[in-house]
């Protein structure tokens, strides 16, 4: 099987990929940072190259994770709204949605990928399974659609209630409790155990203990140390992003920090996203594009904006702390989640951001642009947005170089230019685009919104933890312990659901047994003439 040559598969990943390529249903589960999404992305790349006839839906249970994997939310893609109502109600809703387009989506679908499936209500999973059989006229599990599911039952749990089930039914707490789960997935469950996000063995060990609720003396000692080192990180120009449990605190902190800048006399610049439907000519010259009505485009573009981590309206000034919402250069570490501070604006009013960057030399060949290069890039796009991705370039007045300041010797200054995201219909055809500066204000985020993301530095406020897995999800966002500050942690708030723990004990036992059988078979010396 051809894969990216830079991507090496371990045994667990190889088994998962084999099952996916055999059109088997599968649940890929793992601790945070173990590469669940990366594995699925490589599978999708393989299918696009070798089996383009397959109709694959890439979805997630949350808008943030949907954007991270380049897909749509499950609810919007399948046309089920909030998922409330009876099965009959939902079938009728699907048939009427977009003049029957959603029904056609269900009928033509080959493979349904659901990321963060661990946050899917089990009652809703059962509804979707029955709906698939009704619409497709098939008695096969999920109507014959291949399911590729990924998630972690020990991170953030299912959102209970919401019209999809009885929030007091303790026997239906996880998607794996769904009545149709066993017939859909069976024993095709692969547990990935190799952590890729954190390279520090000590940090990995601590996180894995927290994940399963093993709060021994080592964990208490290490976490206590990181509750006392706040002053050290405060000296940095780029402050750690604060993670809160509640949205209210996030909005309050972001607003108050911007207000301080405004009161100090900083001048703000507004960037409004350009959202545009492709013209008839643009559709005719590209097979990957499709026509749509203005009403359809309005619906799909509104959905995109709602799910996007990039704000439609961005208001920033010099001194504002921001976060990248797009991967500019993965080799250099300039990726979705990289944080920086705006230090000025170019003549064309694009922000110059000073990013923390430990792999600066990888970008050296790109640091050669001039003002003339910028102007030449700006001739072919509408409404003042220059063409192309954001560029890494020299500021005409400020050379890109390391400073003599010891605290700033790992930084890099970039001009951040608009990025284009293409808006697709439910068949994967491109119908228009969303163009915006790929930045967001990043003094604070919710723990929920950063599940699946990696942060270069974080200060985690755990004063309002209320869910199983919430502390583990928050603490596993950074790559190392030195990038983490912890506030208001009560060790009793580190909770793991006992049934989730039992699920993983069972899976590990099953996977160990499979490995033992495979090792035994590989040691047998078969006679070729047998």
Curated annotation (Swiss-Prot):
One of its GO terms (biological process) is DNA repair. Residues 362-408 are annotated as: Disordered. One of its GO terms (molecular function) is ATP hydrolysis activity. Gene3D superfamilies: P-loop containing nucleotide triphosphate hydrolases. SUPFAM superfamilies: P-loop containing nucleoside triphosphate hydrolases. It holds the Pfam family PIF1. PANTHER family: ATP-DEPENDENT DNA HELICASE, ATP-DEPENDENT DNA HELICASE PIF1. This is Uncharacterized protein 030L.
